[in-house]
Structure formats: structure tokens, C-alpha cells
Amino acid sequence: MRTGIFGGSFDPPHNGHLAMCLFARELLRLDRLIVSVSRNPFKTGAHASDDDRVSMARLLTDEVNAAGRFAESSSWELETDGPSYTVDLLRHIADLYPDDELLLLVGEDSYRQMGQWKAASEIPRLCQIVYFGREGYENCQHDAEALHLPVRRIDFDMPVSATEIRRLVAAGQPVSQLVPPSINHYIAEHGLYRS
């Protein structure tokens, strides 16, 4: 089986995440997608609680699965002590699914920081790296390129960010065009991101 791993803080999950999951399913012919909620060692603090982020990731996988069961959410990274590192998640998933071909799905920003990741040179031995590149970044030097990490780039440009969504919610602005309906409802119902 081909298993995609898509990690992130999902604070909150948005339409860009949803589109990336669906796009990856078709383009990469994935059999399974694991959406892993993490603590990003390069970001300072989450804005929603771990429980809220896990709940919203489950809602994201429900949206992805509307066309058939494919995605599952994981809170394994949050359940471990200390910082969360991609290489540890990959080792864990490789132990769970030893016969699967693993594909790590990352966005442009994460890909650009890959050279700073713990055990970055080990990652290609555990999985194929697929990054979703944004227009305008193609000529930039990346840490991952400097390490000669083998990657597959997929052009994908969906200009929506969790930072902007949090800012809009805090300002009392609607975000219904930026997040799936179930996540929009969850944010409102739980009063997330209000200042």
C-alpha cells in the first residue's frame, strides 16, 4: 500500500489542507493518508488546544473521506513526551506498516526548513518526500536542496493560511470561504481564536 503522511499543527485546518489531501490522493495514487497533528518545534505555541486541533483534524479527515474512506487522523506526536520530530513519526509509521511505501507530504514552508530538521538525512531512507510548491519559490535555494534530499515537487498554490484565518476570526470577520463548513462551525461553537 502507498501511505501518505501529512503532518502539521492544523491550527486550524483549512481549504488548502483539504485540497492538498484530495489532490495527493489522486495524483500520488495513495491508498491511505495519515493526517498527523503535531507540535512544530519551529513555531511558538499553538493558538487552539491540542484537543481542539485533534478534533479539527478529525473533521478534516471526515471531509476528505466524503468520497470514500481514505484518511485517518493521528495524535501520536502529541502523545509523546517532548518536542515532535518528523523522523520519529516516520519511524513509528514504518513500524506500524512495515510493508507500505511511505510518502511524506510537506508544504513549501516546511520543505524550505527541512535541512534544520532532526536527522534530515535519514528521512529519505524512510520515505519518498513530496512537497507542494508555491508559485514564486521555484528558484529559491532550499535547505533540503543543499542536503541533496531526493524530492518530488508538485505545483500547488492555494493562497490560504492558518495565520490569516486566526487573524480574521479575532477581528470578527467570516472565514467560511477559507475553511471546510464543519471546521467553520467548530471554530464558532468553541469560540476559538477570539481575542
UniProtKB/Swiss-Prot annotation:
GO biological process, one term: NAD biosynthetic process
Keyword flag Cytoplasm: no
Top enzyme class: transferase
Gene3D superfamilies per UniProt: HUPs
Pathway involvement of the protein, from the record: Cofactor biosynthesis; NAD(+) biosynthesis; deamido-NAD(+) from nicotinate D-ribonucleotide: step 1/1
GO molecular function: ATP binding; nicotinate-nucleotide adenylyltransferase activity
Catalytically driven reaction(s): nicotinate beta-D-ribonucleotide + ATP + H(+) = deamido-NAD(+) + diphosphate
UniProt keyword terms in alphabetical order: ATP-binding, NAD, Nucleotide-binding, Nucleotidyltransferase, Pyridine nucleotide biosynthesis, Transferase
PANTHER family: NICOTINATE-NUCLEOTIDE ADENYLYLTRANSFERASE-RELATED, PHOSPHOPANTETHEINE ADENYLYLTRANSFERASE
NCBIfam families: cyt_tran_rel (TIGR00125), nicotinate (nicotinamide) nucleotide adenylyltransferase (TIGR00482)
UniProt-recorded name of the protein: Probable nicotinate-nucleotide adenylyltransferase
Originating organism: Chlorobaculum parvum (strain DSM 263 / NCIMB 8327)
